[in-house]
Amino acid sequence: KWKNLVGKSFDDIVSKYDLFDWLEGREDEIGAFIHMGACSDTTETDADYLLENNYHYTVDLAEYAIENDIRFIYASSAATYGDGEKGFSDDHEGLLGLEPLNMYGYSKHLFDLWAQKQGVLDKVVGLKYFNVFGPNEGHKGRMASVIPSFVKKGLKDGKICLFKSSEPEKYSDGGQKRDFVYVKDVARITCSFLNNTECGIFNVGSGIAHTWNSLAHSIVSAVDFDVKIEYIDMPKDLIGKYQNYTRADIEKLQGVDDNTMTPLKDAVEDYIKNYL
């Protein structure tokens, strides 16, 4: 993670444990918070840790921002939508009915619900990121996008491994679909909220659901190497917690941003050829 700071310009680095002491007396110096901090491991089972780290800490920071009239932009997640049976609309009216599949998604959902219950969705910006991929994700380990590991394994073993379908009646092997969105687009959209006054919860995705097979073929095309696709069983700790389908409803986002997303094939090629 620290490698991502090399070559970057910043005024200070403050531990999350020291942040509120550091903030004391600096209310007039801060223009906005972009709060991305969280444990994003969808297989994390320590509920107390997730509640404290992802939920309570975010509540504390949001309360500080609201009290001091500071713009607060935070990362929610597409994981809050669960299996997608209730759709992927970012309309506030549907928040209460969402059922995340894992504790990570629930910890994010809890803050969305808190903001709604406290009546502050008109004072904060929640961005529900879908399947983000791109440069500087190596520190995320297993929770990074599959692209770096696919490239490494493809070049080493000549194959890319995709999960077999857990719902063969709905999806073929590799036919599960996700809304993949390039981190460069995500960064641009996130920063755009620093320059407008819009508030509420917004989906951040491409609005297109691509199959894993399609992603794999984009990788094969970018590496320009003979790579085969192999289907493997899903790890037991992911069964029942894995989203087989995501697609962002981006109508609301399109009202505040031009939302010109990089096509998947172009984004994958840029990532692989320029960063991996």
For every predicted segment, state its role.
Residues G154-K156, I189-L238:
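Mid/C-terminal beta-alpha module of Rossmann-like enzyme folds, strongest
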Residues K86, L113-A187, C191-S192, S218-V220:
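NAD(P)-dependent short-chain dehydrogenase/reductase
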Residues G7, K16-N53:
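NAD(P)H-binding glycine-rich loop region in Rossmannoid oxidoreductase-like domains
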Residues N53-H56, N102, G141-S145, R178-K184, ...:
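Residue-level signal for the nucleotide or nucleotide-sugar donor/cofactor binding architecture
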Residues K3-D11:
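Short, conserved SAM-binding/catalytic segment
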Residues V132-N136, L162-R178, F202-H210, I232-M234, ...:
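Glycine-rich Rossmann NAD(P)(H)-binding loop
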Residues E52, H56-D60, E67, R71, ...:
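Catalytic helix-loop patch of NAD(P)-dependent Rossmann-fold dehydrogenases
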Residues E251, P263-L276:
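Amphipathic terminal alpha-helices
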